[in-house]
Amino acid sequence: QFTLTKGERYYFDLSGLSIPGDVNSYLPDTSLHYVPFVYTGTIDAYVLKPASNHVADSSYKASETSDLNAQYGYTYDHSLFMADDQIANNVSWVGLNNDGFIFGKSYTANEVEYTLRAPTVGSTFNTRISPSNNEWDQIEAKNPDYIKFNWNLNPEQGSWGQDNYYYNHVEFKVGRRKLAGNLIGFQENYSDGITYYRPVLEVLNPKTLGNDGLKVITLNLGGGKLGGSGDDIKIVVKNNGTYTAPSYEGLTRPDGNNDTYFWWLGSDGNSYIPGDAVSSDVITLTAKWEPLKYSVTLEPNGGVINNNNIIQYVYGQGATLPSASDMEKEYHTFGGWYTSSDFSGSPVTIIGSTDRG
């Protein structure tokens, strides 16, 4: 559905979603401003709806229909990003579901709409997992490396799925084991150390976006690091749209740099503060860990600035302009600094810390 590179890692800011559980300490950024996901491309798999909860055969019914109005879910082509690692631990299925993270939490990033949710993982395991057209298996059929295993975590780790699992007429919620390749059933309120949340991001409205609807932006960390690596990272934005200049939270400053300054230099030559709107035509942002300076030109209109002249200021600090005691012009009294040549508006005495240019 899209021209992104399958198997490539892209980063998403999930910091504002309040995902339940304990954040996986092995993520490159535990503040969740930079969470890695792997683009799987388009898969044909079933997805469940909330009505499937507590229905024994809901996965099978969804796996056998392409009717989007089907009660429990349906099978269709869709494009996914799979979390590159477990995101949260010690979290129950019901806790996630109560907050909308099992069947779909609306999420918009850089003008692209997604749903963040658990994948379907199958509901029974005899000699193989069924239904086989679940999302987990369809992703692994493309490339097993699209779902990585973290050896630093409990080897028995299971990732919550959407599906129900029944054993001796008792309902369990399904977790999927990467290492063992099988299913594991838990009570829906179980939240011990081997239950994890590893979501997918599904791109919504792919036909509206079109094949070229997504665009990749490269972030050059400029000597800084993310999770110990100084390599460039990539984010996904809407083509022919705008995106938000990313946060510096979660990034590590260059060695020996103890300042607090941060801004992005765009491939268009302009400077951007985190939170600024950036055109998607700006395909690279380079992190700058230094003061952002703006030039200042003071026109004394025939007078003389004897003291406290300024030619530039630092964003975040601002500056105080010369006052009457700093100015001199014979037979004249200083009336203040104005931003317009016709002296309209009120005089300016300072450049604010957030003033730009």
Model regions: which residues?
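GGW-centered surface loops in extracellular recognition modules
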Residues: 1-70, 74-81, 198-210
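C-terminal, surface-exposed recognition/capping segments
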Residues: 1-2, 6-9, 37-39, 44, ...
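Secondary-structure capping and domain/repeat boundary segments
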Residues: 4-11, 16, 207-357
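Sterically constrained small-residue positions within well-ordered secondary structures
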Residues: 28, 73, 190, 276-278, ...
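Surface-exposed beta-strand edges and their flanking turn/coil or helix-capping segments
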Residues: 49-52, 94-97, 232-234, 311
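Secondary-structure transition/turn motif
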Residues: 83-88, 277
